[in-house]
């Protein structure tokens, strides 16, 4: 939910490991991480504000004036510094210390159940959710039925190429237990629902990738 409990078209993407992304948002509309921060700020259903209003609030805060002085050597607060600071924070959010990583480093081993799960993953999920970041960063059709209210055409809205209709950026599976709800529109609350969806993917009338 955004400002005044407004509901947008899409689920908020996770922020970790953005350093490895070349494009941002579900449809890849943004190509620079500093510009990404402006999207939710300007969206009337998210923050419904502007960079000017944000700067004004920060400038009126003695706390932020002090913090900017610590970083930049003076207390000037402008759009360039605000966006640099936000992107620096986002780039610091790195997920590379999971049990999976420790297993790859030879520090731990999977349980038998985890081994079976990993094998299933490699056979059925790894084509799109490629290791070690668990995304191939491509735009694919996930086979979901189209919400008649949202009518979200995905990547097509950016490229205007017919084959890009209903394609969305493949999300990373890292920290998956913490990033619910799932899918680009947040329609699934449980990971099991996602697995059932992909298990039944052939029943959908629209082809999927």
PLM region spans:
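Periplasmic c-type cytochrome electron-transfer domains
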Residues: 1-209
């Amino acid at each position: 939910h955004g400002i005044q409990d407004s509901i947008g078209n899409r689920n908020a993407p996770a922020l970790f490991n953005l350093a490895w992304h070349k494009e941002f948002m579900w449809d890849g509309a943004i190509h620079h991480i500093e510009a990404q921060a402006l999207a939710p700020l300007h969206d009337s259903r998210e923050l419904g504000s502007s960079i000017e209003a944000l700067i004004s609030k920060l400038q009126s805060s003695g706390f932020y004036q002090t913090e900017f002085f610590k970083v930049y050597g003076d207390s000037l607060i402008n759009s360039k510094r605000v966006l640099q600071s936000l992107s620096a924070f986002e780039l610091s959010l790195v997920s590379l210390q999971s049990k999976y990583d420790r297993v790859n480093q030879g520090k731990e081993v999977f349980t038998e159940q985890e081994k079976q799960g990993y094998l299933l993953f490699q056979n059925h999920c790894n084509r799109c959710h490629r290791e070690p970041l668990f995304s191939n960063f491509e735009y694919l059709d996930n086979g979901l039925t189209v919400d008649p209210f949202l009518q979200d055409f995905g990547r097509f809205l950016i490229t205007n190429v017919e084959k890009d209709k209903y394609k969305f950026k493949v999300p990373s599976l890292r920290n998956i237990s913490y990033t619910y709800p799932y899918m680009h529109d947040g329609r699934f609350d449980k990971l099991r629902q996602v697995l059932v969806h992909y298990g039944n993917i052939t029943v959908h009338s629209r082809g999927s990738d």
